[in-house]
Amino acid sequence: MAASHSFAFVVCVLEIGALTAGPTPSYVHEPIQRSDPLQPIDCRMSPWSEWSHCDPCLRQMFRSRSIEVFGQFHGKSCVDALGDRRACIPTEACEDAEEDCEKDEFHCGTGRCIKRRLLCNGDNDCGDFSDEDDCETEPRLTCRNREVQESELARTAGYGINILGMDPLATPFDNEYYHGLCDRVWDGNTLTHYRKPWNVAVLAYETKIDKNFRTEYYEEQMQAFKSIIEEETSNFNANLALKFTPTEAKASKAEEASPKNKSLDDNDKGFSSKFQFSYSKNETYQLFLSYSSQKEKMFLLVKGIIQLGRFVMKNRGVMLTNTFLDDIKSLPTTYEKGEYFAFLETYGTHYSSSGSLGGRYELIYVLDKASMKEKGIELNDIKKCLGFDLDLSLNIPGKSAGLSLTGQANKNNCLKSGHGNAVNITRANLIDDVISLIRGGTQKFAFELKEKLLTKAKMVDVTDFINWASSLSDAPVLINQKLSPIYNLIPVKIKDAHQKRQNLERGIEDYINEFSTKKCSPCQNGGTALLMDGQCLCTCPFMFEGIACEISKRKLA
């Protein structure tokens, strides 16, 4: 299919990786006798610092503390705030920066300055519609009679990441600001013209899909876990430290700026999180880590990626949300760890200067290796039954709009004769669990898949992938991005901009060092420590288990 065609095209990629640890011997538990049984380690914090001086502009004073030791071995986790604030009466005057608009500009109710030519054009240029309040005549619509829709891909453009894997609560970009322009972009999948926001330099609807599912299987749990979290932390975080639950105080209106308010689910604390279907990230990883390799489990990872479009953000003159600007102004000029950590947990440590949008389909099948061996079932038999050995084809719509994928699991492939008996793979207790790490898609699909997993349905197959893919255009997420530090977005005109930029640089470095596995007790017998939401965990080599990898397993003669 020619790339010059006006409709979307397909890039076919074949990538099947297989990582194995060789044949698995049978073991029996034989715990090593210990004279010093492991005791729970509770989170230990440093004492609070002294209160800072009273900030004359914020009329607040601050203090902070540090984490000395993380919880471990079922001890209390470190989930309390590291920063504190209280109101105060300043002893010096606040030197506020002048923020008057130019003569040819209109001063919005939000404090934003816009050109007067943008008044009464039907667009929400101010962010609170105050530019549309006093119109003596009918608004002169920017797009006039041209058909155009708001783009979900464009709303998500620029979204960032947190270096520890947490989903930011808000975006810094106002991607519903158009600067009086009506730049339209055609989407061949939905047969719709979408409006390109002012902040987005390039918006292109280009559909690409892996022709084949990428499958990987692991016998070592730690290998599988590293493969999963590499994408969550974008390879920034090398010390296996993950933090999914915000712990610092948040700006009250920051969530309102987030495009994820249209997304699927909420995490444990009630904040909007990024399109997780079955569980919060914390619950998902805890569930995965509850399956140990020593119980003769095998982990099959199935991945499929669909790209719907790509974007490039402008590198200057962008329109930031009012809440983002207010939160920058609310940062103290002196470095206060808790306040800067809160900002990073709200907006992320980095934003996306360019990237692609769509969805990432990722499932972990926990397989019972002993049962597979007993029934004569191989890994390829399971992949074939689930339909993950099939080629996918993308149909370009004609008269009817929408992304159309074809691919069908053949249930006859789920029957296999082995060891003298016919085995039905779907009913043979070969798949212990299916763990979802899917990103993107609408609420309807989320509920359907969640219900399927909660009923312990093991047959999440290629048909579910097709259903998910059809919902992506309504709820895309970032699947690939080029990142830039969040402090690059601080406008130079803001008071103390240079000092706050330096403070944010320091804050990112401190954030990484604060939540580090260096504050965990060592795991025994070659185990690897990882940190998840304030609790240190041990993942063990194949021949050991236990909360510290302290239990040996000896091979049967």
Swiss-Prot record:
Membrane attack complex (MAC) assembly is inhibited by CD59, thereby protecting self-cells from damage during complement activation. CD59 acts by preventing incorporation of the multiple copies of C9 required for complete formation of the osmolytic pore. MAC assembly is also inhibited by clusterin (CLU) chaperones that inhibit polymerization of C9. SMART domains: LDLa, MACPF, TSP1. The chain crosses the membrane at residues 236-243, 270-277, 379-386, 387-395. Keywords: Complement alternate pathway, Complement pathway, Cytolysis, Disulfide bond, EGF-like domain, Glycoprotein, Immunity, Innate immunity, Membrane, Membrane attack complex, Secreted, Signal, Target cell membrane, Target membrane, Transmembrane, Transmembrane beta strand. Residues 520-550 form the EGF-like domain. Its main location: secreted. Residues 42-95 form the TSP type-1 domain. One of its GO terms (cellular component) is other organism cell membrane. GO terms for biological process: cell killing; complement activation, alternative pathway; complement activation, classical pathway; killing of cells of another organism; protein homooligomerization. Residues 139-519 form the MACPF domain. It is found in: Secreted; Target cell membrane. Belongs to the complement C6/C7/C8/C9 family. This is Complement component C9. The gene is C9.
